């Protein structure tokens, strides 16, 4: 098997593990390798302590990415994963691997432009957190109906909400790396395309925003996911041609 031309590191949303990206591995173009990032205390790292410090978590992610320094790469982040991308860039800047970054795919609204103060979602009651999660139509009944599982999950999601809340105050710098923004048409957090287009303020190479059918977790739908991955492959192909 030929070595892929690109690695795509995928940062999960709050409360999720790297497994949310596993289906992508068989659906993406052959020249792109999907490398899901696992946060400490999540998924296969469930026995490791949760990290509520975005700088520490970003440093760990950056170190993981540097292990693949011989291959050009893409960063994909959904929800809190999008916010962490900018922290990760801070740790990659100045490193040789930073020159290998070809594309950033943002799958989240630019909250720092709409919320000018720290949010306190992590301090909500358990009931309010559950209500918040239900808005996104992705809260499994097997967790909701199992008190032990619910208690365990709420500890993780509260930690991740705290990460997200802190990232709101992050000063996002401008990058020369091309950025494209993806979102779901029915996402309750994104009322219009104009909101997503605000990401263009943070790059010298804005590739636009692309709307997909679906809600906050639009890419969980297999058909939508294929369309999304085809878009990424097409963008990467264009960038490759331009480089050559």
Segments the model singles out, each with a brief description of its role:
Residues 1-244:
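Non-catalytic, mobile gating and regulatory segments of ester bond hydrolases
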